[in-house]
Swiss-Prot record:
Pfam families: A2M, A2M_bMG2, A2M_BRD, bMG1, bMG10, bMG3, bMG5, bMG6. GO terms for molecular function: endopeptidase inhibitor activity. There is a cross-link at residues 1166-1169 (Isoglutamyl cysteine thioester (Cys-Gln)). SMART domains: A2M, A2M_N_2. This is Alpha-2-macroglobulin. InterPro entries: A2M_bMG2, A2M_N_BRD, A2MG_MG1, A2MG_proteobact, Alpha_2_Macroglob_MG3, Bact_A2M_MG5, Bact_A2M_MG6, Bact_MG10.
Length: 1641
């Protein structure tokens, strides 16, 4: 070889010397000519313009073969979009008689390209295009076209045809490979080391395409493939297949000697001559062992069967490997192929079964068999049980939650009395309260909790545990907390049609009545109808998809009925289905019917029916996780079936199944000052197959997919319908494991009885999908019975029922195994059957007699008699609940049933794992030939501060009442003044027996007077009080009706007289006007006649349509001259809202009192706000309240607020000790932790009960942050300064309890103090150093802190602070710890100047941090204050002598200010006086978009912009609020007050599904959560509130629904958005229209 290279080089060497001489000569000649550029040519060349005429009009641009991923289509591209309604199959044809397919030509999304997929490669086609082909513009092609197209050859492609990993040892032809135009492949085989099996199977879950990086990378602590497996063989295979045809070839690995050693092999394949980075991979073991396992609590049942015959496989060795490959357990199966191992399942372990050369491997990191089609659901079955109940499941904030419960074992029998730990959780999952309950007599538990008036709305949960540290609750009860009004009417919708048919009307029946017993005579009834594609028309077929999911239907609901009900409140109406409801797909037809109270408030119910387009439908069930999608570069697997309306299978012949891929053509566009991209869709038919379906079993379909969007289309030639199922491939990052290939075939099981008891014989009939050997098991949390069976159709077997079965989690399981054979293309399989075995418990349910009056009058006692003869002479109790049916109907709350709970089916507690879903399938195909061989992973937003109305909710409860010796109980329940219906329910319990019964009592007065009005009004609003008066006195009479307003309300035409017959009714409307004010007014209705009278009182809040503000004025008194309150401070404010305060002291003019009360009443409750409100409650003791002149704060309120803050903070604490900002999944900001921990220490020092666990966890967190360098605050421009501030504050809090290491504090001062940008962080560090003993460094740090320039602090720093907050805290800290110096006091005056500057710039907005800091400063100053002030206070002519104190404070209302307020001080000057006025302006705030742009728009329910005009009662609108911030705002708060006559349709309660598909400006309401980063939202009586995170420059869109309810004209409030921690950052939206008018229809 060396000689050959030398010979090749020799001529080059020989020619080198002469050439060198020549070059040297040339070089010298250039040097003589002095041409520095050598022979560099001049620039030349002329551009040639290519003449390209633009395409004009409607023409064919090109005809071409469109090939992608081995699939062909003829494509015709036109210059303009085509009209989509044409019959393309008649307008465009192939000249060759190839048999055009119906629906063969498909139109792309941009409508410019037609595609025809039914063509072959390497063929010439001629396409005939009709001159009549129509463009969307109306133009026609004009002349026929004849276009030749040559399809060319298919691109080469190859891959493994199966995702399986078990190759049957007997009767298998090898590993299947599918290919197109690939004649040969190179394959390398590697054997996985046994100890590496767990690591390998954790990384490689299934076959698929992998890159070289995936195969060799060692990232994320994973080993390279070479460290897991050894190369054993490399070879080349010659594949079958004709040119341009897909071929299936088996690689005959059984004949390769190097692959005969038992083990798991990994195969890597590539086409010969290919140098792509993508490799096809598969792994497999060759075995005849079928492995099935069943995992119990501490046992593992193993059954081994022959993959060839299905018979039991005897004496198979078993061993379990842990994650490191070490053997942790070994055993063997018996002669029946069974083994029961003492083993608890671990997902990181692998089970290896071996017998001779057979080896099967089962990793436990795969999902258990999917048994969702079996009735195996239920709750867990622990040793004890709790049945919890309440009278209702819907509460308003401020009401009292009452829960009852029974402690029993899992069969409803008594247990030894022991404490039960209850946890009340908020909607965000955080614990609100935790308490210990001790069972009373017969295991009865009772719990009550007042729901705070500022409680977050949503689903709360009550959980029970016997171990308070347990993460898992044994039982729970969900309740809803929402602002609602009880319904006054009931409405039932029904239809005799089980399904709908096209062109036939939907016959709707409606029955409406008042809950107090009168029919809804003359009431308005409306109904809206919405249609949508129904992909799940059969409830008994979960997981199956039907119909055409791509079908576009009109979004939103259409009004179909608007009618007045007759005298009986009954209606039968035929609704004509809309034109869009064509028989092309099953459709959900939803009717939403509403009956209206006289005042306009609706009661709404929905009814759904499914429109069937044909007698039978084709359905598909994806064999992958629907949410994650199919795997890319693999096979997407489906099951197909065809069923009738009754759900029974039907056969089908000649179904056309087509895999369609969606392709997107992206293009960039410049819009709104920036580049963005858009795309158009086009679709390619990838593969079409003909499929037959039988009635006995489903058909499986496997289709190759890459990464992207697809849909499966199945055309049924009998019905002419096409089922379309869209799906994605390759979108589930990090979830390349498993899918739903673990779904087994189904064995039908039928029991001979409905219930059993020990001693019975159970007979079970087995109907398998195929005959075979198998097992019959009885299981609970352990195997109770195992028997080998021969399963044939209708096989009946008997099993003795033993005492072990006397529980409620017993199931009969049947396993039937089918052997496999390559000769008949049968793959080994197992089928599973499950049926629950109910135990006989009828004798433990008792009959309950319940006697209540059918009708009674209000304000009387309701007599209830309970009789349970079966419990006579036995100890038993009963609880009675009587609840307004108008509350229960909102949620459909069922009657509590203890027997149904205790004896209910529990979930199957067995998880099954096996290898049958991973057996490599047998297909038809050729055998490859060896070419050569070789050897090579909320905040709660409590209701905003406003006057709040009391809403009457009737919920009566007796508690536990003991039955007498005869089994009877007599109970009286006091019924309030209320008209309606009470559902009276009784729950009876003894030690082991239970019963329940309910009845209804109508409550109504002789004269019924019920009023309707808005939930709230704003000053200036005009509305209507609607009063229904009905005569139930039993005789005709004349009745005087009087309506009056108390407070800021005016009622016109307040007195009326009406004559009513027996049971006669009239509706009266009284004009109502809201006057100026800000309080809870009342509407009082009084009706007298026929010797009876009725009087009703209704709270009606009158509140402004915008928020209040604070005005301040400060004075320095250098002489003892009288000072007077300037009435101008209250100018322009609503008098009823004015709250003025005068403060006089020797302290600086800082509004201590107002900020303390302001933060105490702050309405929202994130972590920082909760701690701040807690501070206010902590400091507002009696002495402070008195000295500051604060009104309206009682000791009880203070204690409730403080305890609520402590409980709320405990619920917000995370596992690592920090605190979640707003609960749930909201962010954690570490800078809050020292602030909150400091509050907890202060509360503890004040003697309040603080959870030591919460406090210690927070202190431990601070200690770790101080020692480890704290949080790095990535993304913050001042990250180092913020980290220093956090460490300094943490060190200060720890130093208070002597837990701050002095060495760490010194290091922080010596090395890091230069990073401080605020003086506060240095003061925190200095105080900490001083407390821990280093006074010298401490004083130096404090001095440096006060020397810091106030301007050095960034406006946005990330610590919720400000210059005002920092200055106040700095002074308060040094004073509190005796480190103050006179030089520092200058900051106090600076504070006063800052506050005055803010006041002069407009309203004085202060954040909660600023308010708390100012209050803390005030307390510190008062402690050292020696000077006192006294004087005389004059209010008008009233005089009050005020004794000397350090601070004088008094509060006044608008009337006092009008009379004149003057104070004559006494004391040593200088003195400081401050005047503060809080109130609501008469005029609306002007729109302000300087920081935030807030835009509110209104839309109709079909998503179109609403043109302002009168709204009809019941008319719904969609509200969209768009918020754009100029800067990032992580804590924005939107408050959108409603016009008074409108009410929110609460998404948590209402029938809103008919609006889900409505689209507003391209955003579907069902996707509204993605239109803004909403942390929490609430639907309140009079407002929509949302906390959200805003990103600078981007727009957030929020949506909610409103409905016009009460006639009148109402002011439209502006939308307000503010930063909760930087209140100066706010935006006020423009009001348009200024008013909204609601009219009667």
């Amino acid at each position: 070889m060396r000689d050959r290279v030398a010979m090749m080089l020799r001529p080059l060497v020989r020619g080198w010397i002469p050439r060198a001489v020549l070059l040297l000569t040339v070089a010298f000649s250039f040097g003589c000519n002095r041409n520095h550029n050598g022979q560099l040519p001049q620039s030349s060349g002329e551009p040639v313009a290519v003449a390209k005429e633009p395409v004009k009009g409607f023409v064919l641009v090109r005809a071409y073969p469109d090939q992608h991923d081995g699939e062909l289509a003829l494509a015709l591209e036109f210059s303009q979009p085509l009209a989509a309604t044409q019959e393309f199959d008649t307008l465009v044809r192939l000249e060759q008689d190839s048999g055009n397919h119906d629906g063969g030509w498909s139109l792309s999304d941009d409508a410019k390209t037609l595609r025809y997929p039914y063509v072959e490669a390497d063929k010439h086609y001629t396409v005939l295009i009709s001159a009549g082909l129509l463009a969307a513009t109306g133009s026609r092609l004009g002349k026929p076209r004849k276009e030749p197209v040559y399809t060319g050859e298919l691109d080469p492609v190859v891959g493994f045809a199966s995702r399986g990993s078990i190759l049957p040892a007997r009767g298998s032809r090898g590993v299947p490979v599918v290919s197109v135009n690939v004649p040969e492949v190179d394959v390398e085989f590697m054997r996985v080391r046994e100890k590496a099996l767990p690591a390998f199977l954790a990384r490689y879950h299934k076959a698929g395409q992998r890159s070289s990086w995936e195969l060799s990378n060692q990232g994320n602590s994973r080993k390279r493939l070479s460290e897991l497996a050894d190369p054993v063989y490399v070879t080349r295979f010659v594949l079958d297949g004709k040119k341009n045809e897909r071929a299936l070839t088996y690689l005959p690995i059984q004949s390769i000697r190097e692959l005969r050693e038992p083990g798991l092999y990994f195969a890597v394949m590539k086409p010969t001559g290919s140098f792509s980075d993508a490799f096809e991979t598969a792994f497999f073991s060759v075995s005849n062992i079928g492995l099935h396992t069943r995992a119990y609590k501490d046992k593992l049942f193993v059954h081994t069967a022959s993959l060839r015959s299905g018979n039991p496989y005897k004496q198979v060795d078993l061993l379990v490997l842990d994650a490191k490959g070490e053997t942790v357990l070994q055993g063997a199966t018996d002669d029946n192929g069974n083994a029961l191992l003492n083993y608890t399942l671990n997902a990181g372990h692998v089970l290896v079964s071996r017998n001779g050369r057979d080896i099967s491997i089962l990793p436990f990191n795969q999902p258990a068999l999917d048994l969702s089609e079996f009735a195996v659901a239920g709750r867990e079955n622990p040793w004890f049980d709790v049945f919890a109940w309440s009278g209702r499941d819907l509460y308003r904030p401020g009401e009292t939650l009452r829960i009852s419960a029974l402690l029993r074992d899992r069969d409803g029998k008594p247990v030894k009395p022991q404490p039960v730990f209850l946890r009340l959780k908020q909607p965000d999952g955080k614990t609100f309260r935790e308490t210990r309950l001790q069972p009373a007599e017969q295991g009865y538990l009772e719990f009550t909790q007042k729901i705070p008036s500022d409680a977050p709305t949503g689903r709360w949960r009550v959980e029970f545990r016997t171990d308070p540290a347990s993460k898992e609750a044994v039982q729970g009860l969900a309740v809803r907390v929402e602002e609602f009004l009880p319904e006054r009417m009931k409405l039932e919708l029904s239809s005799a049609q089980p399904v709908l048919r096209a062109k036939a009307p939907f016959t709707l029946t409606a029955d409406a009545a008042y809950l107090y017993g009168a029919p809804a005579a003359g009431n308005r009834f409306t109904a809206n109808l919405a249609v949508a594609v129904e992909q799940h028309p059969l409830d008994n077929m979960p997981g199956w998809f039907f119909g055409d999911a791509t079908l576009q239907l009109p979004r939103g609901a259409k009004e179909t009925i608007d009618i007045t009900l007759g005298a009986d409140g009954h209606l039968v109406h035929d609704i004509v289905l809309p034109e869009e409801a064509k028989p092309v797909s099953p459709m959900a037809v939803v009717v939403s019917g509403s009956v209206y109270e006289s005042g306009g408030r609706p009661v709404t119910r929905s009814l759904k029916r499914v429109l069937w387009p044909a007698d039978a439908l084709v359905g598909v069930r994806p064999l992958f996780d629907v949410a994650s999608g199919a795997d890319a570069n693999g096979m997407a697997r489906f099951e197909l079936t065809r069923v009738g309306v009754d759900g029974k299978p039907q056969s089908a012949k000649g179904l056309k199944a087509t895999l369609v891929r969606e392709l997107r053509d992206y293009h960039w566009r410049y819009s709104d000052g920036r580049w963005d991209y858009d795309f158009t869709r086009r679709f390619e038919n990838k593969e079409t197959r003909t499929v037959d379906i039988s009635t006995s079993h489903t058909t499986t379909l496997a289709l190759p997919v890459e990464w992207g969007d697809y849909r499966l289309e199945v055309f049924d030639p009998v019905t002419g319908l096409t089922m379309r199922y869209p799906f994605r491939a390759g979108w589930s990052w990090g979830d390349d494991n498993r899918g739903l290939d673990a779904r087994p075939d189904k064995v039908k099981l039928a029991l001979d009885k409905t219930s059993y008891r020990a001693g019975d014989t159970l007979k079970v009939t087995i109907t398998p999908p195929h005959p075979g050997k198998g097992l019959l098991l009885v299981e609970s949390d352990k195997p109770l019975y195992v028997q080998a069976i021969d399963a044939n159709p209708s096989t009946t077997l008997e099993i003795p029922v033993t005492a072990d079965w006397e529980r409620h989690d017993v199931y009969v399981t049947a396993l039937v195994f089918r052997g496999g054979s390559a000769s008949n293309n049968t793959t080994p399989a197992r089928a599973v059957g499950e049926v629950y075995v109910p135990m006989q418990r009828k004798d433990r349910r008792v009959a309950v007699g319940l006697v209540v009056p059918k009708q009674m009058r209000p304000a009387q006692s309701l007599p209830v008699t309970v009789s349970v003869p079966e419990l006579a002479g036995k100890q038993a109790h009963v609880t009675i609940s009587a609840v307004d049916a108008g509350i229960l109907n909102i949620t459909g709350f069922p009657v509590p049933d203890a027997a149904a709970h205790f004896f209910a089916q529990r979930r199957l507690s067995v998880d099954a794992y096996d290898i049958y879903g991973r057996v490599i399938e047998s297909f038809e195909g050729g055998t490859g030939r060896l070419k050569f061989g070789g050897d090579m992973a909320l905040p709660p937003l409590p209701q905003a501060k406003r006057p709040t109305a009391r809403s009457q909710t009737v919920d009566l409860f007796s508690g536990a009442v003991k039955l007498d010796a005869k089994g009877n109980a007599h109970i009286q329940l006091p019924v309030p003044d209320f008209n309606g219906a009470l559902r009276v329910s009784a729950l009876v319990y003894s030690d082991t027996r239970y019963g329940q019964r309910d009845a209804e009592t109508v409550v109504r007065a002789p004269i019924l007077a019920e009023a309707s009005m808005p939930r709230v009004m704003a000053p200036g609003d005009r509305s209507t009080v609607t009063v229904d008066v009905q005569n139930f006195t039993g005789k005709q009479g004349k009745f005087a009706v009087k309506v009056e307003g108390v407070g800021p309300l005016a009622v016109a035409e307040a007195g009326r007289s009406v004559t009513l017959g027996i049971d006669g009714k009239t509706t009266l409307n009284f004009p109502l006007r809201a006057l100026e004010g800000n309080s809870v007014a009342q509407v009082r209705v009084r009706v007298e006649g026929n010797g009876s009278k009725a009087e009703r009182h209704y709270d009606l809040p009158v509140r402004a349509a915008w928020p209040q503000g604070l005005r301040t004025q400060a004075h320095v008194l250098n002489v003892l001259a009288p000072i007077a309150f300037d009435p101008a401070l209250a100018k322009g404010l609503m008098p009823d809202s004015v709250n003025a305060r005068l403060s006089v002291s020797a302290l600086a003019p800082i509004p201590f009192a107002s900020v303390l009360q302001g933060v105490f009443e702050y309405p929202y409750g994130c972590a920082e706000q909760t701690a701040s409100k807690g501070y206010a409650a902590l400091w507002l003791d009696d002495a402070t309240i008195k000295s500051l002149g604060i009104h309206g704060v009682t000791p009880a309120q203070r204690l409730e607020r403080l305890e609520g803050a402590l409980g709320r903070l405990a619920s917000l604490q995370t596992m690592n000790g920090h605190f979640s900002m707003c609960g749930g999944n909201s962010d954690v900001n570490p800078v809050l932790t020292p602030y909150i921990a400091g509050f907890l220490l202060d509360a503890k020092d004040a003697g309040f009960a603080v959870s030591d666990a919460v406090l210690q966890k927070a202190l431990n967190r601070l200690s770790e942050d101080l020692l480890s360098g704290a949080h790095l605050f990535y993304g913050n421009d001042q990250s180092e300064a913020l980290m220093f501030a956090h460490q300094a504050w943490s060190g200060y809090v720890l130093a208070r309890v002597n837990r701050a290491p002095l060495g760490t504090l010194r290091t922080l001062y010596d090395n890091e103090r230069g990073k401080a940008v605020s003086g506060l962080s240095l003061v925190h560090l200095g105080v900490a150093l001083s407390l821990q003993g280093d006074r010298k460094r401490g004083e130096a740090a404090i001095e440096a802190g006060f020397a810091k320039s106030e301007g050095g602090r960034p406006e946005v720093f990330g610590d919720y602070g400000s210059v005002i907050r920092d200055n106040a805290l700095m002074i308060a800290l040094v004073r509190a710890h005796g480190l103050a110096k006179p030089a520092y006091e200058a900051r106090v005056m600076a504070l006063g100047r800052d506050l005055e500057a803010r006041r002069r710039s407009g309203w004085l907005w202060l954040s909660t941090q600023e308010q708390v800091a100012l209050a803390q400063l005030g307390r510190a100053l008062l402690v050292d204050q020696k000077k006192q002030v006294s004087g005389t206070l004059y209010v008008g002519k009233q005089r009050e002598e005020i004794a000397a104190s350090r601070l004088i404070g008094r509060s006044f209302d608008a009337a006092a200010l009008a009379r004149g307020v003057r104070f004559v001080p006494q004391g040593d000057v200088p003195l400081y006086a401050s005047f503060e006025v809080a109130g609501i302006p008469r005029q609306a705030p002007v729109s302000d978009d300087s920081q935030l742009l807030v835009v509110r728009r209104w839309y109709t329910v079909d998503g179109k912009p609403w043109t302002p005009g009168p709204l009809k009662e019941g008319q719904a609108l969609i509200v969209r609020v768009s918020v754009t911030s100029k800067q990032n705002m992580p804590d924005a708060l939107l408050t959108d007050l409603l016009p008074a006559g409108l009410e929110i349709d609460n998404f948590n309660l209402g029938e809103t599904r008919q609006w889900a598909d409505v689209t507003v400006d391209g955003i579907a309401l069902s996707e509204r959560a993605n239109a803004a980063d909403i942390k929490h939202e609430e639907f309140r009586d009079d407002r929509y509130v949302a906390m959200l995170q805003l990103t600078g420059g981007r727009t957030a869109n929020l949506f909610y629904l409103v409905r016009a309810v009460t006639p009148g004209t109402y002011k439209v409030p502006p939308s307000l958005v503010e930063d909760m921690y930087r209140p100066a950052l706010r935006g006020t939206g423009r009001v348009a229209p200024a008013t909204v008018t609601v009219v009667q229809p």
